[in-house]
A protein has these predicted regions:
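Metal-dependent catalytic neighborhoods of phosphoester/phosphodiester hydrolases
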Residues: 16, 49-67, 83-102, 106-108, ...
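N-terminal active-site segment of His-dependent metallophosphoesterases
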Residues: 1-68, 75-76
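Divalent metal-dependent hydrolysis catalytic cores, especially in the metallo-beta-lactamase
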Residues: 80-83, 135-136
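Glycine-rich loops and low-complexity Gly/Arg-rich segments
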Residues: 28-31, 67-71, 104-108, 130-131
Length: 136
C-alpha cells in the first residue's frame, strides 16, 4: 500500500498581514499532481488543517476545493483527517457521516465517554490489512 501523509497545512495563515491562500492553493495543485502520478491508497491529513479554530470562509472554501479535487483524482483512496491544536474539532467534523460514505474519515475530537473507542479505519489489499486509529 502507498500513503501520502500531510500535516500542518495551516490553511488561511497570514504572515505579516499577507494572506498565504494563493500560495497554499499552488501547493495543493502540486500535491494533486503528485497524487495523480503516484496513486496512493490513502491520504492522511494529520492535524492543523486550518490556522485558526474559526477559519475564514476563504480558508474553508479552499479546503473544500482541495478535498473535492483529491477525491476526484483518487476516487478509490481513503482520506483520513484528524484535528490538531489549531483546529476546532467540532467544526472539522461537520458532515462527518456523509463524508464517510465517500471514503473520507474525520476525527475532530478524542473519545469523550468511558465506553467510547478511538476511531478505527481498516484497509485491506492482497498483501494484508492496515488499521488506522484516528486520535486527534
Amino acid at each position: 500500500m502507498k500513503f501520502f501523509h500531510l500535516s500542518d497545512l495551516h490553511i488561511g495563515k497570514h504572515l505579516f498581514y499577507y494572506s498565504l491562500l494563493e500560495d497554499q492553493k499552488y501547493v495543493f495543485h502540486q500535491i494533486l499532481e503528485a497524487a495523480k502520478e503516484e496513486q496512493p491508497d490513502a491520504v492522511l491529513l494529520c492535524g492543523d488543517i486550518y490556522d485558526k479554530t474559526i477559519p475564514s470562509a476563504e480558508a474553508v472554501s479552499l479546503f473544500d476545493w482541495f478535498l473535492t479535487e483529491l477525491k476526484e483524482t483518487l476516487p478509490k483512496a481513503l482520506i483520513l483527517i484528524i484535528a490538531g491544536n489549531h483546529d476546532s474539532g467540532e467544526r472539522l467534523e461537520f458532515a462527518r457521516e456523509l463524508l464517510e460514505k465517500e471514503g473520507v474519515f474525520i476525527a475532530g475530537l478524542p473519545p469523550r465517554e468511558a465506553d467510547e473507542k478511538i476511531r478505527k479505519v481498516t484497509m485491506t489489499d492482497p498483501a494484508g490489512e492496515v488499521c488506522f486509529y484516528l486520535l486527534p
